[in-house]
Amino acid sequence: MAGMEIVYTANEVYSRLGVSGSTLRKYSDVLEREGYEVRKNSRGRREYTEFDVVLLQHLVELSKEDGMTLEKAAKLIVKEYGIANKKEEMKEVNPMPYHVQYQLHEQYSAMVAELNRVQQANLLEMEKRLSDRIDQRNALIEEDMSDRKEREERIEKRLERRDENLMKMIREIQEAKRIMEEVAAAKEKKLWWKFWE
């Protein structure tokens, strides 16, 4: 896989970055002082990988920020990408090349983004299910309240009818009692007149 890696010449890189050849050399030197190594061919000329170009592009952008020196920017980049100092790296038995670190970092970032997307989708699905369940429960409560209201209205109407019937009966009883009293009084009056005849 390393043999298939694309390499760029200094001319290609500074054209791509929009800087001069001397600026590219200066930026490469600054990165190398911080422990990053750009490989060189048999004639001692630098050969740039895609990862090298990414770092240099980042360095160009950072160095344009207010109060940011080239050295500060290089230190930040080396720290951000976890690039060890050359001397420390030589102590390692099998140091991981920077471009592999970069690829792993990109893959990890993609995995984290995908995991976040899946978690977000799951959360939205759970929220939807919970919302649906709450809606169903609210609908059942409303239906139950509606049924209860109808029952109460029916009971109230029955009680009203019963009260009306009771009042009607009371009036009828009172009317019958009044008539009976009138009849009794009329009979008594008649008997009294008979007594005097």
UniProtKB/Swiss-Prot annotation:
Pfam families: DUF3967, MerR_1. GO terms for biological process: regulation of DNA-templated transcription. Disulfide bonds: none annotated. Keywords: Plasmid. The keyword Zinc does not apply. SUPFAM superfamilies: Putative DNA-binding domain (SSF46955). It comes from the Bacteria. GO terms for molecular function: DNA binding. The keyword Protease does not apply. This is Uncharacterized protein pXO2-68/BXB0093/GBAA_pXO2_0093. It comes from Bacillus anthracis.
